[in-house]
Curated annotation (Swiss-Prot):
Binding site for L-aspartate: 121, 125-126
CDD domains: ASS
Official protein name in the record: Argininosuccinate synthase
Molecular-function annotations in GO: argininosuccinate synthase activity; ATP binding
Coiled coil residues, start to end: none
Length: 403
């Protein structure tokens, strides 16, 4: 008896998910495999996927357009939370996983499947993200994980697929594993597994090299409303168009490349190369506007909780209760994050050169100025310092008396 009758497989068109189709049928006795691929803005990469799955033995090959919810419901909350895992990675890949899992469960319900499956390996983050998200949304659904159990090496997996007429997508010339969506690209494997090897220019596609970036700088203005980016250089943009334009601007000037050693959920360190031009640009601008519009104690607390929010998303806990509670905090803080940030883009750098808010700024020039318009009561400082420093004076006196 097979492990399931009808399975919906999260499908990317890569080696592992393609091999999963015949493997589920031949080795695990699954009667029918339906694939689901999410359109997250990959572009031309999606074109051959539908037929590729059918050629591998899928009974149906479904592709769902998830670009708009991906940006509105996942990327924009990440911008409001200034989400940077370990202070650097803006979660471009991690943000996609809960959305794919959500739609995978919905498709399984629609077609009457008794299980879902994915092609994640046993040492990556995505297995955690998919399994935990599916368990959160549909604890009754069986999750099949052939790539975690089949025990084949990369070479053996490719050879298995070739038995069923699958061409190898990995060549000696291009040995990299690449994940792509509208927010960015993640590149790993091949020579990049040596952390001392510099990434060759050929692995980048969304950003220009510093040498190829324009010699002249470009100044832009990004406007935010309630923490969401809504316009660039005075032109209002819907969320998807906003990400595309931010990608174009930042990528042109070589902004958005990351090369980092990352701590995976499973406990190992991995070397990751990311291209996330637009997302990094928008987060930088958003952080700057918050410095102008949030009270000091709120800003400090939010910076601490941003790290926790980022960890939860990275660790696959998007649908968990703590993440939901933190969402409420983040949303409340954004009510007055309104204004404009001006940045200068040049040769890999985005430098903030101005920020302003007509209705939400907590910067009061008359209080900050040292000129004739200064309205700060300097005489009040003495009493404030006395009370502020009282615990220190009492502590110092106690030390002296104990000698």
């Amino acid at each position: 008896m097979g492990r399931a009758k009808k399975v919906v497989l999260a499908y990317s068109g890569g080696v592992d998910t393609s091999v999963c189709i015949p493997y589920l049928k031949q080795e695990w006795g699954v009667e029918e495999v339906i694939t689901f691929a999410a359109d997250l803005g990959q572009g031309d990469e999606l074109e051959p996927i539908r037929q590729k799955a059918l050629d591998a033995g899928a009974s149906q090959s479904l592709v769902g357009d998830l670009i708009q919810p991906f940006i509105e419901d996942f990327a924009f909350p990440a911008i409001r939370a200034n989400a940077l895992y370990e202070g650097r990675y803006p979660l471009s890949t991690a943000l996609a996983r809960p959305l794919i899992a959500k739609r995978l469960v919905e498709v399984a319900r629609e077609v009457g499947a008794d299980a879902v499956a994915h092609g994640c390996t046993g040492k990556g983050n995505d297995q955690v993200r998919f399994d935990v998200a599916i368990a959160s949304l549909a604890p009754d659904l069986k999750v099949l994980t052939p790539a975690r159990e089949w025990g084949m090496s990369r070479e053996e997996t490719i050879a298995y697929g070739e038995r069923f007429g699958m061409p190898s997508p990995v060549s000696k010339k291009s040995p990299y594993s690449i994940d792509l969506n509208l927010l960015g690209r993640s590149i790993e494997a091949g020579p990049l597994e040596d952390p001392m090897v510099a990434p060759p220019e050929e692995v980048f596609a969304m950003t220009r090299s510093i040498t190829d970036a324009p010699d002249a700088f470009e100044e832009i203005e990004i406007r935010f409303e309630s923490g969401n980016p809504v316009a660039i250089n005075g032109q209002s943009l819907d969320p998807v168009a906003m990400i595309r334009e931010a990608n174009r601007l930042a990528g042109t000037h070589g902004i958005g490349r990351l090369d980092m050693i990352e701590n995976r959920v499973v406990g190992i360190k991995s070397r990751e190369i990311y291209e996330t031009p637009g997302l990094l640009l928008l987060i930088q601008a958003h952080q700057e506007l918050e410095s102008l519009t949030l009270a000091a104690d709120v800003l400090r607390s939010k910076r601490q909780l941003e790290m926790q929010w980022s960890d939860l998303v990275y660790q696959g806990l998007w649908f968990g209760p703590l993440k939901e509670a933190l969402d409420g905090f983040m949303d409340r803080t954004q009510e007055h994050v309104n204004g404009v940030v001006r940045l200068r883009l040049h040769k890999g750098n985005a430098t903030v050169i101005g920020r302003g808010s007509s209705d939400s700024s907590l910067y009061v020039p008359e209080m900050a100025s040292y000129g004739s318009e200064d309205q700060f009561d300097h005489r009040a400082a003495e009493g404030f310092i006395y009370v502020w420093g009282l615990p220190i004076r009492l502590w110092a006196a106690s030390k002296r008396s104990s000698r």
